[in-house]
Curated annotation (Swiss-Prot):
It is found in: Cytoplasm. It catalyses: tRNA(Cys) + L-cysteine + ATP = L-cysteinyl-tRNA(Cys) + AMP + diphosphate. GO terms for biological process: cysteinyl-tRNA aminoacylation. A motif ('HIGH' region) lies at residues 31-41. Binds 1 zinc ion per subunit. The gene is cysS. A motif ('KMSKS' region) lies at residues 268-272. The lineage of its organism: Bacteria, Bacillati, Actinomycetota, Actinomycetes, Mycobacteriales. ATP binds at K271. This is Cysteine--tRNA ligase. It comes from the Bacteria. Belongs to the class-I aminoacyl-tRNA synthetase family.
Length: 460
């Protein structure tokens, strides 16, 4: 089957045809390590980790680049406010992001370039834009000339976001000498006390948009397959990346993919609103694999509304899968179901893929109850294949757990097995058995909590 991707640039589902057959090249806008990561940040990493895993599962050799924006206005401001060197501030939070990615099972990128390590590439990029007539230098800063580019043959400025040029204003704070309000900084002239690098136009530091265009094309070439990022980056960041690249003569990305926000009480999760949830705090409620399951469970283009009940229900869903595989015992990874492949090939439709997994779990448990171990093992092998693609194969996660984690896991599996028995009894209206399971767990200090999506448990 052919993978189809919703391309933000054309607002259509398109067949994925890689630039180089047998290979896939992907660029993901990564972290700006100005503060601790929250689940809004991490959703993007998990969503496109699933994309990457599916491309790999289809036999493609994937070059996956995820950058680090290690210099920008917010970093400098926060470091200064806290009396710390900017590079030390960045290093602290970059380590937190790396820990978070690793903890949630996000595969390491093929390359993780930092902006400050690619000033040479940025200088060359600016020179090309100036030579082509689409950038200009003023008092040590370099700006992209939006008016000149928007009038040029082949210009598509505004097409990604749907904005009109006349309605755009970049809001650059350092706008002295700009020819137009839409123009944005490629390079910012040095200020006292700030880090700077030498260029032919004066010392300074890179603009945000220039960094990604220069690094993406340096590592993936002037034309590559997929550019990913959060929906909030669509404008101005990604719109300006496209403008720079096309004005420089590069074809740039063939497909654009954007994940939607994590919201709380209907509002986008953001530091400015004070409604962010740091990953370590979340991990006090659920295990890392359960948080990954939750973050990846919604379609990447859908809003993920956070609530404690939604997180608990996701954990219950994962534990059902885990409990089934524990019942079956050791099985090798098999083949995914045809329905799973259809779901993943249709714009990475994880909710439909999860439905395939849970159908297989239900059928497998039924087979075990009937004594058909061969059928159960075949289904378990399929479940392992499907959960592996999504990055939460319970067997793989279990093998990576420490002693404490294994003890917790064993306890959880035992209780989940009892909850499955109770659920079966309730479905058969065998209330005596259902009550017996509940009471026995209560005697052990475990409270059963019934939710719309099944039962979970907590210590009394």
């Amino acid at each position: 089957m052919t993978l189809r991707i919703f391309d933000t640039g054309t607002r259509t589902l398109r067949d994925f045809k890689p630039v180089q057959p047998g290979h896939a090249s992907v660029y993901l806008c990564g972290a700006t390590p100005q503060s601790s990561p929250h689940i809004g940040h991490v959703r993007s990493a998990v969503a496109f980790d699933i994309l990457r895993r599916w491309l790999m599962a289809k036999g493609l050799d994937v070059a996956f680049v995820r950058n680090v924006t290690d210099i920008d206005d917010k970093i400098l401001t926060k470091a200064s406010e806290n009396g710390r060197p900017w590079w030390e501030w960045v290093s602290t939070y970059e380590r937190e992001f790396t820990w978070t990615y690793n903890t949630l099972g996000v595969l390491p990128p093929s390359t993780e370039p930092r902006a400050t390590g690619h000033v040479t590439q940025m200088i060359k990029y600016m020179q090309r834009l100036i030579d082509n007539g689409f950038a200009y230098a003023v008092d040590g800063s370099v700006y992209f000339d939006v008016a000149a580019w928007s009038k040029a043959e082949g210009s598509d400025y505004g097409s990604l976001s749907g904005n009109r040029v006349e309605d755009m204003e970049q809001g650059e704070p350092d706008n002295f000498g700009k020819r137009g309000p839409q123009d944005f900084a490629l390079w910012k002239a040095a200020k006292p006390g700030e880090p700077s690098w030498p260029t032919p136009w004066g010392d300074g530091r890179p603009g945000w948009h220039l960094e990604c265009s220069a690094m993406a094309t340096y590592y993936l070439g002037e034309q590559f397959d997929i550019h990913c990022g959060g929906l909030d980056l669509q404008f101005p960041h990604h719109e300006n990346e496209i403008a720079q690249a096309h004005a420089a003569g590069d074809k740039f990305a063939n497909y654009w993919m954007h994940n939607h926000w994590v919201t709380m009480a209907g509002e986008k999760m953001s530091k400015s609103l004070g409604n962010v949830l740091a990953v370590p705090e979340m991990l006090k409620q659920v295990r890392p694999v359960e948080l990954r399951y939750y973050l990846g469970s919604a379609h990447y283009r859908s809003v993920l509304e956070y609530s404690e009940s939604a997180l608990s229900e996701a954990a219950v869903g994962y534990r059902r899968i885990e409990s089934f595989l524990e019942r079956v015992g050791d099985v090798e990874v098999g083949e995914w179901t045809p329905g799973f492949e259809v779901a993943m090939d249709e714009d990475i439709a994880v909710p439909k893929a999860l439905a395939e997994i849970h159908n297989a779990v239900r059928e497998g448990n039924a087979a075990l109850d009937k004594g058909d171990r061969e059928a159960a093992e075949k289904l378990a092998s399929s479940v392992r294949a499907m959960t592996g693609v999504l990055g939460f194969d319970p067997v793989e996660w279990g093998s990576d757990a420490g002693a404490d984690g294994k003890a917790d896991k064993a306890l959880d599996v035992l209780i989940s097995s009892e909850l499955e028995r109770r659920a079966t009894a309730r479905a058969e209206k065998n209330w005596a058995v259902a009550d017996e399971v509940r009471d026995r767990l209560a005697d052990a200090g475990i409270e059963v909590v019934d939710t719309a999506d099944g039962a979970t448990w907590k210590l009394q």
